[in-house]
Amino acid sequence: MFHRFSKSILFAPLLSLLLGGIFLVSCGDDDDNEDVQSYSSKQKDGQNKDYTVNGVTFKMIYVKSGTFIMGATSEQTGAYSDELPAHSVTLGNYYIGETEVTQELWTAVMGSNPSRFSGNMQCPVEMVSWNDCQTFISKLNELTRATFRLPTEAQWEFAARGGNNSQGYIYSGSNTIDDVAWYASNSSSTTHPVKMKAPNELGIYDMSGNVWEWCSDWWGGYTSSAQTDPTGPNTGSRRVFRGGSWYSIATHSRITIRDNCAPSISGKNAGLRLAQ
């Protein structure tokens, strides 16, 4: 099922054997806390929110509730079987990160930068496993007294599609991939600073390309039945990631592309985006 990734990612032979061809490349103080909380709490629900952690500011984009068709819809030519069947999903209001978590924000929270491509702190953090992301989010919540988490797969796709403002694009924000994504043909084999490409309909950046983004869900197949606020299977051995990366070909950067990996594995093309 995952040959599309083993063909597009250089992979250590032994690790590739062990993982069955999965894509990954061996894959403040109290006063500061008060400042963070007062800064964000001045903003009302239904508006975008800004947070500052140890001098690093990041934005959460408000996504209004809506119903959409999740999975490979008609514009998603070349879709794989795991993108089907397309099905109706209804979501409540939520927030999602304007950008992927940067190396700057990760370092402000964790005190270190695990990234392979560490030349620019505005690049997305990578070399972080799903488990690493949970540790980061727990510490971020302690600092901000907020409730950050990873997005569900459904929340990720609705936001990537542009929410209720969706224009039905193939990639997140455009049918022309070079306008919105860093991918195999234009990345020069590295990540790039966030917000260098055009945003999508909600003002969200890099949901196609740059780095794959972990979601909260266990991996599982789709169902044809309508769902409300789905969170994926109750148990599993692999977690979902979405969006493609700097190493992905164009068809692997589409909005509906999906794959999975063990939660303990990290890669130089995998990072995260926050949700609330």
Question: Model-found features: residue ranges?
Answer:
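Surface-exposed recognition segments
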Residues: Q76-V89, N164-N165, S187-T190, V211-Q276
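Feature responds to low-complexity, polar/acidic, surface-exposed segments characteristic
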Residues: R116-Q122, Y171-G173, S224
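Short aromatic-cysteine micro-motif
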Residues: G55-T57, A79-N164, S185-Y205, Q276
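Alpha-helical phosphate/pyrophosphate-handling elements in metalloenzyme active cores
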Residues: V180
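Bacterial Sec-dependent N-terminal signal peptides
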Residues: G20-Y51
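Mature N-terminal segment immediately following signal peptide/propeptide cleavage
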Residues: T57-I69
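Hydrophobic alpha-helical segments, especially N-terminal targeting/anchoring helices
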Residues: Y51, Y205-S208
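Sec-dependent bacterial lipoprotein signal peptides
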Residues: M1-V25
